[in-house]
From Swiss-Prot:
GO terms for cellular component: extracellular space. The gene is SERPINA13P. It is found in: Secreted. Glycans are attached at N150, N250. This is Putative serpin A13.
């Protein structure tokens, strides 16, 4: 039976000037810097870390898919990369090298100083706010914890919960992990993205319909309907279809629909170059399609997955 991940939502964030990172979330979005034929801008610090970030994202996705067959996957790779990079900056030399190499960096090619500069540049660029777009990302280190700390672990956890709820506007709720007595520091990382469709669905055309989450199970969902022009292609080699839907605020979502039974084939074949190829081959077509309203929630433990 085919896994329930019938849609593969691969998201790229290209903030400002092609600083690339990957993300999956409730309505995954690709922030796109402009037309394909636009002239390239000057090199930015984040360019030097983009290739490693993309490669890390695909490797982590495959690990998540392998360890949770048939389950939905929701993660923000650049957030994980940034957290590990930030931890490395205060670590001993051996640990710092291990963390950065685990993220896919070759330190003889990209020095530590350039990696640090690139992540700070990316953090600044992955932010946007407007009437129809909100993108925030930040992290905070809570240190001075443990048996000899001035505050109890319960007080520290309360501060972390309050920070998380405030920064994510209550979308993530309280932080669920209990702090152990051996905990001396906590690094909290968050990302919030909300964007409206450029061509909104007609709410009057939405009606309850069945949606199959796998070959044998269906649920009733609010099914949106739209007839509009979107960029679309069918990849015969990877046996999938790709739909690009634009949002307000210069953002875009890529939805990837594998042919029946071909999800694993598609996952194994995905490369950073694949996204670039798709973006150049998409053509505008008049589409008449149904689209379910959906929500995804997922908790992942990464201790055994990260290199």
């Amino acid at each position: 039976m085919e896994a329930s991940r019938w849609w593969l939502l691969v998201t790229v964030l290209m903030a400002g000037a092609h600083c690339v990172a990957l993300v999956d979330q409730e309505a995954s979005d690709l922030i796109h810097s402009g037309p394909q034929d636009s002239s390239p801008g000057p090199a930015l610090p984040c360019h030097k870390i983009s290739v490693s970030n993309i490669d890390f994202a695909f490797k982590l996705y495959r690990q998540l898919a392998l360890n949770a067959p048939g389950e939905n996957i929701l993660f923000f790779p650049v957030s994980i990369s940034l957290a590990l990079a930030m931890l490395s900056w205060g670590a001993p030399v051996a640990s710092r090298t291990q963390l950065l190499e685990g993220l896919g960096f070759t330190l003889t090619v990209v020095p530590e100083e350039e990696i640090q500069e690139g992540f700070w540049d990316l953090l600044i660029r992955l932010r946007g706010q407007g009437p129809r777009l909100l993108l925030t990302m930040d992290q905070r280190r809570f240190s001075g914890l443990g048996a000899r700390a001035n505050q109890s672990l319960e007080e520290a956890q309360k501060h972390i919960d309050e920070y998380t709820e405030q920064q994510t506007q209550g979308k993530l709720g309280a932080w669920e992990k209990d702090l152990g007595s051996e905990t001396t520091a906590v690094l909290v990382n968050h990302m919030l993205l909300r964007a409206e469709w450029m061509k909104p669905f007609d709410s009057h055309a939405t009606s309850p319909k069945e949606f199959f989450v796998d070959e044998h199970s269906a649920v009733w969902v609010p099914m949106m309907k739209e007839k509009a022009s979107h960029r679309f292609l069918h990849d015969r080699e990877l046996q999938c279809s790709v739909l690009r839907m634009d949002h307000a605020g210069n953002t875009t979502t890529f939805f990837i629909f594998p042919n029946r039974g071909k999800m694993r084939h598609l996952e194994d074949a995905l490369l950073p170059e694949t996204l670039i190829k798709w973006d150049s081959l998409l053509r505008t077509r008049e589409l008449d399609f149904h689209f379910p309203k959906f929500s995804i929630s997922r908790t992942c433990r990464l201790e055994m997955l990260l290199p």
